[in-house]
């Protein structure tokens, strides 16, 4: 079944309409937050009726889950395990952390809208924040923490709670992205490429946790 687009003439399939509503919802949520955005406003911006929004997403919770699923399945998704797979197989610590840092920085640069949306969700104590934590953040800690633990057993890295190492690593990357996207978009404090940032952050981390020969 198809419906007519707001512009008239062209017709949009159900899945295309669903994606359009999702994109509009992400845009509005990232600008106004969740409390400041109604389904009526989403419908108006998407050029559909509010009933059409609920036809595709029966509840707001279903819409939030669809947003995460849409981001996870998009072509520019950030999959740490896949991104670092080759370096992990070679036990290349520099390659692991540098590839992950660069991948995350590029992802944040290409999708600042989703980063703003996640900040809104956390500040408003919105359920999307917990959904994102469970679906992504927790998995990153488990995956990267597991690699660090293995390298500690092999004597390559010093003994330290792997969660602390992961927290420090993510902290450097996230702070840099937040500065570039939100606080200092003109990059007056620090203006370096993502490649350079990833390299230097990896230097700092490995100089702190590598076992000196």
Q: What positions do the PLM features span?
A:
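N-terminal intrinsically disordered/low-complexity leader segments
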Residues: 1-16, 80-87, 213
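C-terminal peripheral helix-coil segments that are non-catalytic and often amphipathic
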Residues: 1-6, 95-106, 110, 138-154, ...
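Generic hydrophobic, amphipathic alpha-helix propensity
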Residues: 17-26, 42, 67-71, 75, ...
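Helix-turn-helix
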Residues: 20, 28-62, 66
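Short hydrophobic clusters on alpha-helical segments that form packing/core surfaces
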Residues: 21-29, 104, 205
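Hydrophobic alpha-helical connector segments
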Residues: 66, 79-113, 162-169
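Short, flexible, glycine-rich and Lys/Arg-enriched loop motifs at helix boundaries
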Residues: 69-93, 179-193
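Short secondary-structure transition hinges
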Residues: 88-90, 105-143, 188-191
């Amino acid at each position: 079944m198809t419906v007519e687009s707001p512009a008239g003439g062209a017709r949009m399939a159900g899945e295309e309409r669903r994606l359009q509503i999702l994109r509009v919802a992400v845009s509005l949520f990232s600008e106004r937050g969740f409390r400041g955005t109604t389904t009526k406003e989403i419908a108006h911006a998407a050029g559909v009726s509010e009933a059409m929004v609920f036809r595709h997403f029966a509840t707001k919770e279903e819409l939030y889950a669809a947003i995460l699923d849409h981001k996870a399945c998009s072509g520019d998704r950030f999959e740490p395990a896949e991104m670092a797979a080759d370096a992990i197989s070679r036990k290349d610590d520099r390659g692991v952390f540098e590839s992950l840092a660069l991948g995350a920085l590029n992802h944040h640069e290409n999708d600042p809208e989703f980063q703003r949306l996640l900040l809104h969700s956390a500040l408003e104590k919105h359920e999307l924040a917990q959904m994102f934590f469970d679906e992504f953040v927790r998995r990153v800690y488990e995956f990267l923490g597991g690699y660090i633990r293995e390298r500690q057993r092999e004597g390559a890295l010093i003994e330290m709670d792997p969660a602390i190492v992961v927290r420090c690593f993510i902290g450097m990357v996230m702070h840099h992205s937040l500065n570039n996207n939100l606080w200092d978009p003109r990059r007056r404090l620090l203006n370096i490429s993502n490649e350079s940032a990833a390299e230097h952050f990896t230097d700092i981390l490995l100089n702190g946790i590598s076992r000196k020969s």
